[in-house]
Amino acid sequence: MTRDVSQLFGTDGVRGRANFEPMTVETSVLLGKAIAGVLLEKHAGKHRVVVGKDTRLSGYMFENALIAGLTSMGIETLMLGPIPTPGVAFITRAYRADAGIMISASHNPYRDNGIKIFSSDGFKIGQAVEERIEAMVASKDFGKLPDDHAVGKNKRVKDATGRYIEYAKATFPKGRTLKGLRIVLDCAHGATYRVAPSVFEELDAEVICYGCEPSGCNINAGCGALWPSTIQKAVIEHKADVGIALDGDGDRLIMVDEKGHIVDGDMLLSICASDLKRRQALPDNRVVATVMTNFGVLRYLESLGIQVTISPVGDRHVLQHMLENQAVLGGEQSGHMIFLDYNTTGDGIVSALQVLRIMIESESTLSDLTACIVKSPQALINVPVTKKVPLESLANVQGVLKEVKEVLGDSGRILLRYSGTENICRVMVEGTKKHQVDSLAKTIVDVVEAEIGAGISE
């Protein structure tokens, strides 16, 4: 399938269905050459790029395609194999690599795949670099090819996951263990299926694993951070202390308390922000949240004297606002949490360790830590769409939004936006009465589906 390759990058790298543009082998080879071209523009000479992936079946072909493009331009590549996205960011820094590449479509189904690119400092590349890569791919002008003796070598790094495991454990206080904790862990059959059980078990927790048998086609399938109902049931069944659900590439975290209640990213951010403030480790008493963050959570944080900077949805925007405001903690409802004291991107395993540390140090259950946070009633519905038409151009949609806003008045809010990574329109309604919020959200969903819907919403 062909597509204009002048715009490859979305809100989180390149993403799409495998074997459809832009996620084809042909375009991936060009991307590899373009990444090399950008590095060589900065300075000539030897360069090193690390390449990791999640467990999708298509990961093999994209790994080989990217490496072919990179090595053809004289770049040395290091294959990490299956490893979480934050692991690639960490290894990029640890190996003093010039760039890191993660092959993953994160929480998307197995049929999709994607490419995330990190600079040498472990942060995702910015828009200017993305645009330069796109220009090179479109023009196919990558610079001079090296002589035959100067093409790049490819090596497999055998201890990449071991290094990441040790790094993750090092974020947990020395002298403390997880002894006595029974943890239900769901790795979504994804990139954390080896490293996450090892991290928690080596810290002496009892770990009951779900989603740790990847087939290449079962990543995120009814499991992981997008399907916490799996561990809700398991926590009760196994009488566990806590449940931990990660997504396919390991940068999201959703938890479940000992009573089987879901603790989402908003709640986890509140727990960690409160702890950092108590320890005087929260600069300017500031955290970064998003427009999706529950009003009840915002009120709770403000009651603690914590300032909240609001960013658009997406970990790139959260990180940008963190850097601009010198914040060390930011996160979003979906479970992305960034601890800049530890890593340069969202890290589900490290985030879980911080929550577990707080539980242990405060001698509290997870339900104890959330008891004082009262969330506002909120409905969030994902509507599959056929195309992303500008919402302001849809008269019927704008009409129903106006009607719902009049019903809510000043006591609620509506957020309607397209996903940056999927053909989905997200409908969020928040108010004071749960039944009213659900009903109003359904009213909006019905109109959106009638206008641009592609199937059953969820």
Swiss-Prot record:
It comes from the Bacteria. Activated by phosphorylation. Binds 1 Mg(2+) ion per subunit. CDD domains: GlmM. NCBIfam families: glmM, PRK10887.1. Catalyzes the conversion of glucosamine-6-phosphate to glucosamine-1-phosphate. Belongs to the phosphohexose mutase family. This is Phosphoglucosamine mutase. It comes from Chlamydia trachomatis serovar L2 (strain ATCC VR-902B / DSM 19102 / 434/Bu).
